[in-house]
């Protein structure tokens, strides 16, 4: 892939795959680290999900309503891998897909962040291991479940 950030990550995977590249510490002090290999794997699966399930491609726009969490890194990198533009806090009606955290999704659906538009809303997990969301707002899809089945 020609993305310079992806190339840097691939280089890191070749040189030091187990070293952390993303460290997230939640409000309770729980620490989650993603190694270069884990970040690359998660981003590749998420990119495949975006491309194959939501038909995201170069020129697509993704509204990102994800809290400061390790998932934000994964889904931003995944969008860039597809050639899409990431719009942090983007207006849902001006984007092809909305990626939201579980606490942000209801606001997206209610119009808190602007007109809702016709695109899907995928909800990312904020579980330390990225497990599927136990409950989703009506009309949302679970990003963890969609990405997990990707090659």
Residue ranges of predicted features:
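Conserved AMP-binding/adenylate-forming core of the ANL superfamily
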Residues: 22-56, 77
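A generic secondary-structure signal
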Residues: 11, 49-53, 111
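Structural core segment of the AMP-binding/adenylate-forming
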Residues: 8, 77, 81-151
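Cytosolic catalytic domains that perform sulfur/thiol-centered chemistry
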Residues: 7-11, 34, 57
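Residue-level marker for well-ordered alpha-helical positions
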Residues: 6-7, 44, 70-73
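Conserved AMP-binding/adenylate-forming
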Residues: 49-85, 89-90
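A short N-terminal helical cap/helix-turn-helix that marks the beginning
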Residues: 2-22
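ATP phosphate-binding P-loop of adenylate-forming
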Residues: 21-23, 150-151
């Amino acid at each position: 892939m020609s993305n310079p950030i992806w190339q840097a990550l691939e280089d890191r995977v070749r040189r030091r795959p187990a070293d952390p590249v993303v460290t997230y510490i939640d409000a309770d002090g729980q620490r989650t680290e993603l190694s270069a290999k884990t970040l690359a794997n998660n981003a590749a699966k998420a990119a495949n999900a975006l491309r194959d399930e939501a038909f995201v491609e170069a020129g697509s726009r993704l509204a990102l309503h994800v809290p400061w969490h390790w998932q934000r890194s994964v889904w931003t990198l995944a969008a860039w891998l597809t050639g899409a533009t990431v719009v942090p806090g983007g207006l849902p009606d001006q984007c092809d897909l909305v990626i939201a955290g579980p606490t942000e999704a209801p606001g997206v659906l209610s119009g808190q962040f602007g007109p809702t538009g016709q695109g899907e809303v995928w909800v990312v997990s904020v579980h330390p291991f990225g497990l599927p969301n136990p409950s989703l707002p009506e009309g949302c899809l679970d990003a963890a479940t969609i990405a997990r089945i990707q090659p």
